[in-house]
Amino acid sequence: MIVGVGEAMVEFAPAGAGLYGRAFAGDALNTLWYLARLGAPARFLTRVGADALSDGFVAFLSESGIDAGAVSRDPESTMGLYLIELDGAERRFLYWRDSSAARRLADDPERLDSGLAGATLVHVTGITLAIIGVEGRRNLVEALGRARARGARVSFDPNLRSRLWPDEAVAREAQAAIYAVTDIALPSFDDEATLWGDATPQATAARLAALGVDEIVVKNGAGAALVHGGGEVRAREVEARDTTGAGDSFNAGYLAARLRGHTGLDACGLAHRLAGEVVRWPGALAPAATVEAMA
């Protein structure tokens, strides 16, 4: 069982003629959704409201083949939302998430342990770390340590969103703590250059390897992904319509292939192909049938 831990948000993406389509998304959720489409058993650990919108999200998980048993409900909050504005294939996000119930997804250590029970892989992101606060981060890191002791592996995508952190020092401290319980690191080079001052993807990989992370893939946008100790894998050129969800789908393609026993280099090949397909569609989630055909 793969467990994704993070925030689910309501997404409004341009649908043409000045209209917006509604969907559910979030970086860890996107990765988990793509993993489920690729045939992996998946569970989402999050916290949402007790309103009709949150009911719709839980139904969405079930319809997507994702176990919703680790979704807790908060009667005093609801889901955050964001709106995508496009400039060509690039996008700008407007967020409304201050009252998001997911900010309290890690408040209860027992609930974390229950949600992570039976996991073979747990996927976490830097956005999750940013929104759950100091106590939540401590609870989550400790819960991940217990999950690893039970045999789970942990994958982490730093996915830096500077505006969610009080300052860079807090973000670096939080990342350092979670890397102590991380087996697979999936950073993006531009984030690492911003937060850590890394000059090259190789410098990022070397820094994380020195922290004891076993498996490292450094993404570099449309450029080559670096597999630490293995080499680089280049992406094929595609005409991008919307790059939302590209990194999340890359993570899913890579993890799905590794779980099937493929090498890191081969797994990057699938990851690039999946991400290249995803950017051809609007919003974070490509059509399910398109993704399932790649399984």
Which sequence ranges carry the predicted segments?
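Conserved phosphate-binding/catalytic region of the ribokinase-like
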Residues: 145-146, 197, 201-295
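Conserved N-terminal subdomain of the carbohydrate kinase-like
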Residues: 12, 41-127, 295
